[in-house]
């Protein structure tokens, strides 16, 4: 029997098949700011070109005769940022002149000349560019005629590093600069974490990182998590930490630190890229040697690890449509990895033999594949008289698998201790908090409520669209109140 896989691996495109020269597929000449566009700088004969590949229409690349030192496409629209301009190659101005063009309108939107060379830059949102110089980091908004604003000075721990990435949380209150350098026959990762509110930096040893928003069970607001992976002399680690003060009323996230496994034959391997899937609350970690690691963000459990590319994947972005990660390797393959929805829960349950994690992820992401686990848990709690817990399991089980007439009948048969809420009403209470009741649930909830003469409750639920209207419900209301 072939083993089920919890991931889906896809090759979207081979860049050499759409006219891209293999020599142009590198960190210095190819950029991918999102899953929408790939941008390549190429020399064709004597002329310099910028090639834009729309990943929704990859067989029709747009070629423009542009001479630039660097080119990055906006993550959302056909807007391109160019560094250096014709005639500045090799001059002091090459790294300082920044221009933003709207490709469709064929118009220049903004331009700015920096005092210092920009050695790394990145779109951090559809309307903001981050600019990194040897000494500082700036944010440049596309709004109006605003100038780049200095966010922070670089920490000395990044001196002499090649800057490979820059990340922010969604509100741009936490900023992170990542660099690497060769030391004692290994690649060392150096990061600078900066808090805009506190105006202070923390140097951290790390190779790849990402921020994530994660809503813990029972919390009203999502927690802002900082996830980073590192390979030190001692070994590999993944850390997941909540940054800043937890939002009011939230339980704090317990920080996690787990080992990142590197096989014996990958002595010099290290993490190079990380993306967090908001869709599945998982971390995708990619290493220099082309291994993918998949972690659950809540528990930091490693769900899966395998080699997906024999060549280094040197640029990645979130793959929005699948909740996955997309990347380009040195060979010019455009690859993506995402969660295989139908397989991940059975895989965690049977291959990892971790039913608790299977239940958690199934509930969190409304995924099928753990039906028998939910039925077993519900029956066990019910038999133990833990009706409130059983009600929670029945209400939260994915795809409504336990929201059946049988479940309601089971709760109806349980005697209610004097002065306490009946288990049936506890069950309906949880369902009402979550959204609309189905036809059968609506009838069975309204029956005892109308018998108690509490018609105003029913009117409230109808107004809030919590009940599914049906002929039978109408008849029930008429019987209780013929007026």
What kind of region is each of these model predictions?
Residues 1-13:
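PEST-like, low-complexity acidic/proline-rich intrinsically disordered segments
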Residues 9, 16-483:
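Extended alpha-helical assembly domains of large eukaryotic scaffold proteins
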């Amino acid at each position: 029997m072939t083993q089920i896989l919890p991931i889906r691996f896809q090759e979207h495109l081979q860049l050499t098949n759409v006219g891209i020269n293999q020599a142009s597929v590198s960190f210095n000449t190819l950029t991918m700011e999102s899953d929408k566009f790939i941008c390549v700088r190429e020399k064709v004969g004597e002329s310099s070109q910028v090639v834009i590949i729309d990943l929704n229409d990859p067989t029709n690349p747009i070629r423009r005769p542009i001479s630039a030192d660097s080119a990055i496409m906006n993550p959302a629209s056909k807007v391109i940022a160019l560094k250096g301009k014709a005639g500045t190659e090799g001059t002091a101005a090459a790294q300082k002149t920044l221009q933003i063009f709207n490709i469709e309108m064929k118009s220049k939107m903004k331009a700015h000349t920096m005092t210092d060379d920009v050695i790394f830059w990145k779109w951090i949102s559809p309307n903001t560019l981050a600019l990194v110089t040897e000494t500082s980091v700036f944010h440049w908004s596309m709004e109006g005629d605003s100038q780049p604003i200095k966010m922070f000075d670089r920490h000395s721990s990044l001196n002499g590093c090649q800057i490979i990435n820059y990340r922010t949380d969604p509100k741009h209150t936490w900023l992170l600069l990542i660099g690497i350098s060769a030391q004692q026959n290994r690649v060392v990762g150096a990061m600078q974490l900066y808090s805009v509110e506190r105006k202070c930096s923390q140097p951290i040893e790390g190779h790849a990182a990402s921020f994530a928003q994660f809503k813990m069970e029972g919390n009203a607001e999502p927690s802002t998590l900082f996830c980073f992976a590192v390979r030190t002399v001692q070994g590999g680690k993944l850390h997941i930490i909540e940054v800043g003060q937890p939002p009011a009323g939230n339980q704090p996230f317990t920080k996690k630190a787990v080992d990142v496994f590197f096989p014996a034959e990958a002595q010099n391997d290290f993490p190079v890229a990380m993306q967090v899937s908001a869709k599945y609350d998982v971390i995708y970690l990619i290493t220099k040697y082309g291994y993918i690691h998949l972690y659950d963000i809540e528990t930091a459990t490693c769900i899966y690890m395998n080699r997906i590319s024999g060549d280094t994947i040197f640029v990645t972005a979130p793959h929005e449509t699948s909740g996955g990660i997309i990347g380009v390797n040195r060979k010019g393959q455009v690859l993506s990895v995402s969660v295989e929805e139908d397989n991940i829960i059975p895989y965690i349950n049977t291959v990892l033999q971790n039913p608790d994690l299977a239940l958690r992820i199934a509930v969190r992401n409304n995924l099928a594949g753990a039906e028998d686990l939910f039925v077993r848990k519900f029956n066990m709690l019910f038999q133990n008289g833990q009706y409130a817990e059983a009600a929670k399991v029945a209400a939260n089980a994915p795809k409504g698998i336990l929201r059946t007439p049988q479940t309601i009948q089971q709760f109806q048969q349980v005697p209610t201790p004097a002065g306490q809420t009946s288990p049936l009403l506890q069950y309906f209470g949880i369902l009402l908090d979550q959204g609309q009741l189905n036809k059968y649930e609506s009838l069975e909830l309204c029956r005892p409520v109308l018998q108690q003469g509490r018609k105003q409750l029913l009117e409230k639920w109808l107004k809030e669209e919590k009940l599914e209207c049906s002929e039978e419900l109408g008849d029930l209301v008429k019987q209780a109140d013929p007026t």
